[in-house]
Amino acid sequence: MTRREFAMLMATALPAWGLTAPKRARAAEPIPVTLYKNPQCSCCESYAQYLDQNGFKVDVKATNDLAEISRKAGIPEHLEGCHTSFIGGYVVDGHVPVKTIRKMLDEKPAIVGITLPGMPPGSPGMGGEKTGSLIVYAVSRDGAVASIFDVD
């Protein structure tokens, strides 16, 4: 390779590489999460670890007012999960799989958030075997409408 060819290669390759650098840096930054849970709940700790292992930075806050936090966040009582998280301007209630959270964050729907009601066996952070599909609901801003957001 001649000096001129090398110079041309560097003149085109380096700027192109530089354009991708910010994307690489952003991908490595963990997504902040605030997770509220009952002080005695160990599955919530397991779920927080699951999020930490999948690109999130979780701040766990123990509270005895979890139902009130969920209600104020717009989650209907019959759709409440085991814990309530706040991620990227949305509420995520229960043991929602990471792929579903990422889907919501990528699509940016006009909703309050998503919820996986109860404590389904085999869901992220829960023990046991998965006994059926995990149905994650989208909760509208007025809380009146809940529709299926994703099924895992």
Question: Where is each model-derived feature located?
Answer:
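Short active-site oxyanion
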Residues: 32-33, 56-58, 88-91
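C-terminal segment of N-terminal export signals and the immediately downstream linker at the start
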Residues: 21-38
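N-terminal secretory signal peptides and thylakoid transit peptides that target proteins
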Residues: 1-14
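Thiol/selenol-based redox catalytic cores and closely related redox-interacting motifs
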Residues: 72-152
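Iron-sulfur (Fe-S) cluster-binding segments and ferredoxin-like electron-carrier domains
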Residues: 49-56, 60
